[in-house]
Amino acid sequence: MQEERLTHLRQLEAESIYIIREVAAEFGNPVMLYSIGKDSSVMLHLARKAFFPGTLPFPLLHVDTGWKFREMYEFRDRTAKEYDFNLLVYKNPEGEALGINPFIHGSAKHTDIMKTEGLKQALDKYGFDAAFGGARRDEEKSRAKERIYSFRDKFHRWDPKNQRPELWHNYNGQINKGESIRVFPLSNWTELDIWQYIYLENIDIVPLYLAAKRPVIERDGMLMMVDDDRIDLKEGEKVEERMVRFRTLGCWPLTGAVESQAQTLPEIIEEMLVSTTSERQGRVIDRDQSGSMELKKRQGYF
């Protein structure tokens, strides 16, 4: 009998589905973190495949900062309604009461209070012992050395020196009470893999990933899209229409657009084939200080 050979994408798909099923079987109260971006959309698609024709055996959790793009909120609510997902939305109540925002308080404080602390609060509130995330190793250097099962202590902290071996796809999910595991089923995928899979599987994505004329300003070497009237224009800044798209999505004041003509998935894939820069070049939170992503993860970030 001739052995069937899986394509590169089907191998990645099979690995991710295996990981998702393993977590669902091994942990008592898992959750899938849903940030509404392309990686979350792929991860959610894989989870649906993993348990088809049944429903997802865990909820989705969106840690909301209040500063996502309007199109992201619309996409989130439409997706949850269309597939009848159990979507939990959590916002740090203390941060909301203090009016924490990226313009006044800066990216570091905004991210720490509204994202890191918000996530930790949500995980504690619902008692989740495992949380799926859409991070990939090719995105950023601290993520490159993180395991698929990322152990977190009772304070949700990550210690890069205290990681468990993962030989031959064997994952150690043994934890004590109060500890948890962050699980990254897309660890071995690249940005190009993600886009090719989205095209292959016809996965719905937020339209912001496709190039269109959008209102932007130039600030600190970044093209910031003006998404609502909370924009804090500085002297000399002028809003202008440019043909841009986003390679990564987050809070709109902290996420830079790139000039592009790629209006279709094949055009995005073609653009990725010649790209020499990281998709996270437009994320302001990665510029806070040297090693800022690893520091954030040590403190409990995604």
From Swiss-Prot:
Catalysed reactions listed for this entry: sulfate + ATP + H(+) = adenosine 5'-phosphosulfate + diphosphate
Top-tier EC class: transferase
Keyword Nucleotidyltransferase (UniProt): yes
GO molecular function: ATP binding; sulfate adenylyltransferase (ATP) activity
Pfam families listed in its UniProt record: PAPS_reduct
Record keywords: ATP-binding, Nucleotide-binding, Nucleotidyltransferase, Transferase
GO biological process: hydrogen sulfide biosynthetic process; sulfate assimilation
EC number: 2.7.7.4
InterPro entries xref list: PAPS_reduct_dom, Rossmann-like_a/b/a_fold, SO4_adenylTrfase_ssu, Sulfate_adenylyltrnsfr_sub2
The protein's annotated pathway: Sulfur metabolism; hydrogen sulfide biosynthesis; sulfite from sulfate: step 1/3
Family: Belongs to the PAPS reductase family. CysD subfamily.
Function, as annotated: With CysN forms the ATP sulfurylase (ATPS) that catalyzes the adenylation of sulfate producing adenosine 5'-phosphosulfate (APS) and diphosphate, the first enzymatic step in sulfur assimilation pathway. APS synthesis involves the formation of a high-energy phosphoric-sulfuric acid anhydride bond driven by GTP hydrolysis by CysN coupled to ATP hydrolysis by CysD.
NCBIfam families attached to this UniProt entry: CysD, PRK05253.1, PRK12563.1
Assembly behavior: Heterodimer composed of CysD, the smaller subunit, and CysN.
Name listed for the protein in its UniProt record: Sulfate adenylyltransferase subunit 2
Upper taxonomic lineage: Bacteria, Pseudomonadati, Pseudomonadota, Alphaproteobacteria, Sphingomonadales
